[in-house]
Amino acid sequence: MAKEKFSRTKPHVNVGTIGHVDHGKTTLTAAIATVLAAKFGGEAKAYDQIDAAPEEKARGITINTAHVEYETAARHYAHVDCPGHADYVKNMITGAAQMDGAILVCSAADGPMPQTREHILLARQVGVPYIIVFLNKCDMVDDAELLELVEMEVRELLDKYDFPGDDTPIIHGSAKLALEGDKGPLGEEAIMKLADALDNYIPLPERAVDGAFLMPVEDVFSISGRGTVVTGRIERGIIKVGEEIEIVGIADTQKTICTGVEMFRKLLDQGQAGDNVGILLRGTKREDVQRGQVLCKPGSIKPHTHFTGEIYVLSKDEGGRHTPFFNNYRPQFYFRTTDVTGAIELPEGKEMVMPGDNVSITVKLINPIAMEEGLRFAIREGGRTVGAGVVAKILA
């Protein structure tokens, strides 16, 4: 049979497995891919294919991540699984693999463990919007009351980090049984139930093109007789000729009008998410716009200087700092296209941060940046990346 070409007929959703080490994340990933491949087509993946995750780089940080694809009757999923705990932390903070929803794997035999808690907290901090729970290894627990107790603990933990514990789907099963071809309620049936929960509990993500127009400014040119052209890649939304836009960040917010959109030297009526374009601005001087600002739909994004963030600090081996840093450390924060200096305040009782740590911090920037919760940044010292982070909460 000829190899079928990839046809994107089903809507696409990004998910991933999270949870404590050895609770069965990779086994479950293999089980989902195998069971759904048999049902809806696609490629079954063996455990060792997933476990040997290739290295990739995101924001200057090396991360091991395995990518698996599978389909349900309604959707196409891209699923990420990480071999080690540090990879999860890095993955979630850098947004290397953005998740529309996560599958929290928790062993019924052990109940919630430290990384179970840490991954739920990380999911909350980095803005993973939905969690589904797979209570794994249920074949090892004979006591129904014990299962109920573990389920209750998981729901309480989700509640604690502002996920709707009572409404979260929790599926009981055994990834190992499912992978071995067991057709029973803990085997294949549990995987089908999980697939059903993915389809019904995780809403379709908003497509980038449907968002409010936003384009980070990469370069600014002055073209005689035509005015000022700003180039960059449109992050989301659509810009049409004649529309009003705002220039946000670094300086005071200004209003202007898009009088032209150019791509590959051709004039267009509009540009949309993903396009690399030049946007012509009416009445705006070349010195009024600079790299690091954004063009956006008026009122859709505001400039901020004060926020809390979740950061990962590169270890020495990863090319990071060799020494810890302390309260009031002042590196550069690289947002989208530019560096802004900021001061770091550590959480109470935290003396210092070692290379290789992840930590929640509060930051005050010297210049405002167009910012939303969930925005990613790199932390740099003289152009060298020493960490990565995500805006958890805007304070001012």
Curated annotation (Swiss-Prot):
Q: Which reaction does it catalyse?
A: GTP + H2O = GDP + phosphate + H(+)
Report the residue ranges that make up the tr-type G domain in this protein.
Answer: 10-206
GO cellular component labels: cytosol
Pfam families attached to this UniProt entry: GTP_EFTU (PF00009), GTP_EFTU_D2 (PF03144), GTP_EFTU_D3 (PF03143)
Q: Where in the cell is it found?
A: Cytoplasm
Identify the stretch(es) annotated as G3: 81-84
The record, for PANTHER family, names:
ELONGATION FACTOR TU, MITOCHONDRIAL, ELONGATION FACTOR TU-RELATED
Q: What is this protein called?
A: Elongation factor Tu
* Species annotation: Polaromonas naphthalenivorans (strain CJ2)
